[in-house]
Swiss-Prot record:
Reactions catalysed according to its record: alpha,alpha-trehalose + H2O = alpha-D-glucose + beta-D-glucose
Source organism per UniProt: Emericella nidulans (strain FGSC A4 / ATCC 38163 / CBS 112.46 / NRRL 194 / M139)
Protein's recorded name: Cytosolic neutral trehalase
Its job: Hydrolyzes intracellular trehalose to glucose. The disaccharide trehalose serves as a storage carbohydrate that is mobilized during conidial germination. Regulates the level of trehalose as a protectant for cell integrity during heat stress.
Protein activity control: Activated by calcium.
């Protein structure tokens, strides 16, 4: 970060300010853009005030100022003198935006970053002088904030604005937190109903000849089927294709649906429409990850819920639990995402913890107990029908695997993605590439090696860790640390809920039973307690390595433990399944293997192995770090009393995000290279990085990174948050605290 990137007042207070200051126009300088840029009255007030000046004063227009001041870089001494009062700038949006980009955006990417070689100083006219007096805005951070504010003002159609200097010099921790809470969550929120089905129903991964909005409605929701058919009739221009799903979902059926891929319906609620005066259906909202991920995703939603709760958006977190329960009830599982080609594929299960966290915030509201009951019943059904059933359950070890059933090439990727893999098989059968893919998908040619490959490929995608050398070509055989830690948490949570909230007996309605549990009319806590104890015993037997102080995945086919060191070993601490002795071993032996400059890395460099042209980097391997690994680790460390470790690692992760945010025009991305101090958002592995490619201003960040930021701030004390606001590296902060502590000890001794 360049020396002038941050203004001198950014570290003032925990949030950069002790309270929101009222601007001279009577408004909060940190208002939401809907309010701040939604009303042009502030500019009119400035103009009216000027008209009230003595008529003996010479009248100046904007061209006069340009002729007087020109475009020269004026000395700081010739600018508006420093004032104790917050400045406001009177700005012509289009002209200023054009001039700013011409001067400062040297690489012409519509962003102002530390890599641009402009003068890093830009003069603005003050509102108090009607633009006559000028003031320099200096440094990458303030200039990029100016670009962002002008871009947003232009989005709102504003030609002129009065802009608070405080909005440019705002403490970066406060600014990013505010953007996440007030803007990013809203930008990432979706509903599926007639008002937006045209956009939501379209799929960029629809490779068919006739891509069109299409929605599949489960047979158990006839009211939705009627609703969407009505929408299709009322709006024929949408070309909306409404289909009812079959009652039985098989791999063959899902394969056939790939010819007509579509959106899967989610939960709806009845709402009164003030415009029509009638009650109609509205989609229950959900938060999407961002970028090209525009559906309800499985474990992304849990991670996002942690941030939503930290942002006091309990309504959205609750709504996503409701959507998950709908998915389990009608589709049999929490889906990878709500698209037809994901019908046989799930994702890491977090429903019980998610529901309990939401319940803790709504427990005094009407219907809270019904909400908890419904969520736990759904989790029990998912546990039995998905994770404790074939093909995911390994009957020998008693542990579970990611092993999604399916047929053929995964349709969400273009077939050309597997060109290198499939071409030799096509040549073997004397077929063109597309012809072979079609023949293979429909069983006209048999290739057991490909069957094995795609079984593991689907498993990797179900694990959420796509892709990693830890899982490649073997995932479907692995009883992984992460999945079995999550299922242990399910077992413990379900036992506690039944015991504490339902008097140790939870009645199971017929719709929440599975073929294997059709005769189980109620559940008791003791059964689930025993399951948790058995799972821990099996994990300690098959997965725990005493010498290395960590858990490893277990290959159920080879019947041996793997040796890939993965940060998922720390999920066991999050789940609470380790003993205090094991926790101590993980902190002293395992954690140092994963701790890097920017937090926890997905896996060790040694485990990943050499990479190069013929063995490219995978995004879930070293040197990349992901928000889920960080949040679960912090929570696990704090759970076992390792608060210092939790704070240190949270600080490192948040510092890395903050520094990229300050230096690179407000960027917030899907994943980071936790070994790169300068530009950690630069990730070239596989699919690139979501959240990088924006023009002028970031609109949404990325779901689980947004969550990790506001959730992580809750881990830090006030002193750490102030240091973070000054973009202080952990090492500098730690040394300062240690030195301060040493001085205090010496002072006490001298007394």
């Amino acid at each position: 970060m360049d020396d002038s990137a941050l203004p001198s007042n950014t570290s003032n207070g925990i949030n950069g300010r002790t309270a929101h200051r009222r601007s001279s126009s009577g408004g909060d300088p940190f208002q939401h853009p809907d309010i701040y840029y939604g009303n042009p009255e502030s500019v009119e007030r400035i103009k009216n005030r000027r008209r009230a000046f003595s008529s003996s004063l010479k009248s100046f227009n904007r061209q006069d100022f340009h002729e007087m001041l020109g475009d020269r870089n004026t000395r700081r001494g010739s600018m508006d003198p420093t004032s104790g009062n917050p400045r406001k700038f009177l700005i012509d949006v289009d002209a200023t935006l054009h001039s700013l980009l011409e001067r400062e955006d040297s690489d012409r990417n519509m962003q102002i970053t530390i890599e641009d070689v402009g003068p890093k100083v830009f003069s603005l006219g003050t509102a108090a002088s009607h633009g006559y007096n000028r003031f320099d805005v200096r440094g990458t951070y303030m200039l990029s904030n100016l670009l962002q504010e002008l871009t947003i003002a232009k989005d709102y159609g504003r030609k002129q604005i009065v802009l608070d200097e405080e909005r440019l010099s705002e403490n970066p921790v406060s600014r990013l937190s505010r953007l996440i809470k007030n803007s990013f969550w809203n930008s990432l929120t979706r509903r599926i109903d007639g008002r937006n089905i045209e956009v939501a129903g379209r799929d960029p991964k629809d490779w068919t000849d006739d891509p069109r909005p299409r929605i599949y409605v489960p047979p158990g929701a006839p009211e939705q089927l009627e609703y969407y058919r009505r929408i299709a009739e009322e709006k024929p221009e949408l070309r909306l294709d409404v289909q009812e799903l079959a009652a039985e979902i098989t791999p063959e059926y899902v394969r056939d649906l790939n010819e007509k891929p579509g959106l899967l319906a989610l939960a709806m609620e009845e709402k009164y429409d003030e415009k029509t005066g009638k009650t109609d259906f509205a989609g229950v909202p959900f938060v999407v990850p961002g970028g090209r991920f525009n559906e309800l995703y499985g474990w992304d939603s849990y991670m996002e819920s942690l941030g939503l709760l930290a942002s006091n958006r309990v309504d959205l977190a609750k709504a996503m639990v409701i959507n998950f329960c709908f998915c389990i009830k009608h589709y049999g599982k929490i889906l990878n995402a709500n698209r037809s080609y994901y019908l046989t594929r799930s994702q890491p299960p977090f429903l019980t913890d998610m529901a309990l966290r939401v319940y803790d915030r709504i427990q005094n509201e009407p219907g809270a107990m019904d909400f908890l009951r419904h969520a736990i019943l759904a989790a029990i059904k998912e546990y039995y029908s998905v994770w404790m059933a074939e093909p995911r359950l390994d009957p020998v070890s008693g542990l579970s695997r990611y092993r999604s059933p399916g047929i053929g090439v995964p349709p969400e990727t273009e077939a050309s993605h597997f060109l290198h893999l499939l071409t030799p098989y096509a040549e073997k059968h004397g077929m063109e590439f597309k012809e072979f893919v079609q023949a293979y998908n429909y069983g006209k040619v048999k290739e057991p090696e490909l069957d094995e490959y795609f079984m593991h490929d689907r498993a990797v995608r179900e694990s959420g860790h796509d892709t990693s050398y830890r899982l490649e070509r073997v995932c479907g055989n692995l009883a992984t640390v992460d999945l079995n830690s999550l299922l242990y948490k399910y077992e413990v949570d379900i036992a506690r809920v039944i015991r504490v909230y339902f008097k140790d007996k939870l009645e199971i309605p017929v719709e929440f039973r599975t073929p294997a549990t059709k005769d189980i009319q109620s559940e008791s806590s003791s059964v689930w307690d025993r399951r948790a104890r058995r799972r821990k015993m099996r994990m300690d037997t098959y997965l725990w390595d005493e010498e290395k102080g960590m858990y490893f995945d277990y290959d159920t086919v080879k019947q041996e433990r793997t040796n890939y060191e993965s940060a998922t070993t720390l999920w066991a601490m999050w789940a609470g399944l380790v003993t205090p002795r094991q926790a101590s071993a993980m902190i002293t032996k395992a954690l140092p293997r994963f701790e890097e400059f920017g937090g926890i890395v997905s896996g060790t460099e040694e485990s990943r192995g050499a990479v190069g042209l013929n063995r490219p980097t995978r995004q879930w391997d070293y040197p990349y770090g992901w928000a889920p690994q960080q949040m679960l680790a912090w929570t696990g460390f704090a759970r076992y009393g390792y608060q210092e470790e939790a704070e240190r690692l949270a600080y490192k992760w948040l510092y890395m995000i903050t520094k990229a945010f300050v230096d690179f025009n407000g960027v917030v991305v899907e994943k980071y290279d936790v070994t790169r101090p300068i530009d950690p958002h630069r990730v070239d592995a596989e699919y690139g990085n979501q959240g990088v490619d924006f023009k002028g201003a970031p609109r949404e960040g990325f779901g689980w990174v947004n969550a990790s930021y506001v959730y992580g701030l809750e881990m830090l004390n006030a002193h750490q948050r102030r240091a973070l606001g000054a973009v202080t590296p952990w090492e500098t902060y730690s040394k300062a605290v240690s030195a301060q502590g040493s001085d205090t000890v010496l002072e006490n001794r001298s007394e």
